[in-house]
């Protein structure tokens, strides 16, 4: 399950870490904020265990011919995957966007963070989206463009909290302590707006009859709890790493609010996170399905489980 709100808030969260998760930028290594989220180096053993990414074909001389741009897998994994192209869907748990692209929530999204967690963002060129803002704007005006774009995705071990590649003339990023404080404030504001059931959109207009908000699914409720927990975390020392965030399990919900069959922990220390299979309605483990660092092929076990239930129902009748 792998880490972006736009601006400091979104980028602190993946693998919410998100938001660690979605982007790895070249960034200025001297910026203190980046030190908090630097991925560990990949060991030779970890790299040797990587399989060729889907779409890579072997050439006549045994050389790999890769018809796609390769990027590092989400989180702190060490293997390569094909990057998402311009216009393709993207989010916290999807492969990164290609070079020069960023994953943006849709401009009309009321909850950009949730949209990105659900993989409902779009890979767009930096500056094309309405949410885009320069790193300086985001850093100096935490209240402006708070739901901005995500950092550029390069095959790099550094996670740039403020977006984009590094370069001379960029202002130093603010401390991790300040960034987490801004993140906490933004998440709290999102929950407050959710609780209003849409009233904040009425502005000065005459009161309208509002529909009651739809009931939250178990997956959405679990995600809300995780976000609430992050929003109330104690601020770390500004130089202290935020490893405690990695221990959180961020549920992988689909666009309908159901659990995705495959749930995974975030990649860490050069190792892929473990993945397991759950029932899409309840989030409970599917018995017999393995927990592995790879694809447990959950659809096979889910179909088998559903088939067994169907046979049992027929016998009961």
From Swiss-Prot:
Modification after translation: Cleaved by MMP9 leading to release of free IGF2 from IGFBP2-IGF2 complex, which contributes to enhance the motility and the growth of astrocytes.
Molecular-function annotations in GO: insulin-like growth factor I binding; insulin-like growth factor II binding
GO biological process: positive regulation of activated T cell proliferation; regulation of insulin-like growth factor receptor signaling pathway; response to insulin
Domain Thyroglobulin type-1: 216-298
A cellular-component GO term for this protein: extracellular space
Motif segment (Cell attachment site): 293-295
SS bond partners: 39-76, 42-78, 50-79, 68-82, 90-103, 97-123, 219-253, 264-275, 277-298
Superkingdom of source: Eukaryota
Positions of the IGFBP N-terminal domain: 35-126
Region annotation (Disordered) ranges: 126-146, 190-218
PROSITE patterns: IGFBP_N_1 (PS00222), IGFBP_N_2 (PS51323), THYROGLOBULIN_1_1 (PS00484), THYROGLOBULIN_1_2 (PS51162)
Intracellular or extracellular location(s): Secreted
Main location: secreted
CDD domains named among the record's database cross-references: TY
Keyword vocabulary terms for this entry: Disulfide bond, Glycoprotein, Growth factor binding, Growth regulation, Secreted, Signal
Pfam families reported in the protein's UniProt record: IGFBP, Thyroglobulin_1
Signal peptide: 1-33
Function: Multifunctional protein that plays a critical role in regulating the availability of IGFs such as IGF1 and IGF2 to their receptors and thereby regulates IGF-mediated cellular processes including proliferation, differentiation, and apoptosis in a cell-type specific manner. Functions coordinately with receptor protein tyrosine phosphatase beta/PTPRB and the IGF1 receptor to regulate IGF1-mediated signaling by stimulating the phosphorylation of PTEN leading to its inactivation and AKT1 activation.
Record's subunit section: Interacts with IGF1. Interacts with IGF2. Interacts (via RGD motif) with integrin alpha5/ITGA5; this interaction induces cell migration, adhesion or apoptosis according to the context. Interacts with PTPRB; this interaction leads to PTPRB dimerization and inactivation.
Notes concerning its domains: The C-terminus is required for IGF-binding and growth inhibition.
Protein name: Insulin-like growth factor-binding protein 2
Gene: IGFBP2
């Amino acid at each position: 399950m792998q880490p972006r709100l736009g601006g400091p808030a979104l980028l602190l969260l993946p693998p919410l870490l998100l938001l660690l998760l979605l982007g790895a930028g070249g960034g200025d290594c001297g910026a203190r904020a980046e030190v908090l989220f630097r991925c560990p180096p990949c060991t030779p053993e970890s790299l040797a265990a990587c399989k060729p990414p889907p779409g890579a074909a072997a050439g006549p001389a045994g050389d790999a011919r890769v018809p796609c741009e390769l990027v590092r897998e989400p989180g702190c994994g060490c293997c390569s995957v094909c990057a998402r192209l311009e216009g393709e869907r993207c989010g916290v748990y999807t492969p990164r966007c290609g070079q020069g692209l960023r994953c943006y929530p849709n401009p009309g999204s009321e909850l950009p963070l949730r949209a990105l967690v659900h993989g409902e963002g779009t890979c767009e060129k930096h500056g094309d989206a309405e949410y885009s803002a320069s790193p300086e704007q985001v850093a100096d005006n935490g209240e402006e463009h708070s739901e901005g774009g995500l950092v550029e995705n390069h095959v790099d071990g550094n996670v740039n909290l403020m977006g984009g590649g590094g370069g001379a003339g960029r202002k130093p990023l603010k401390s991790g302590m300040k960034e987490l404080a801004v993140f906490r404030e933004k998440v709290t504001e999102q929950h407050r707006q959710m609780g209003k059931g849409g009233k904040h959109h009425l502005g000065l207009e005459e009161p309208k009859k509002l529909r009651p908000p739809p009931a939250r699914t178990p997956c959405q409720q679990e995600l809300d709890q995780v976000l609430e927990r992050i929003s109330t975390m104690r601020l770390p020392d500004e130089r202290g790493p935020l490893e405690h965030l990695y221990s959180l399990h961020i549920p992988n919900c689909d666009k309908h609010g159901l659990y995705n069959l495959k749930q995974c922990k975030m990649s860490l220390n050069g190792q892929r996170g473990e993945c397991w299979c759950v029932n899409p309605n309840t989030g409970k483990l599917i018995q017999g399905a393995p927990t592995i660092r790879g694809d447990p092929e959950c659809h096979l076990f889910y179909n088998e489980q559903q088939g067994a239930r169907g046979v049992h129902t027929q016998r009961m009748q």
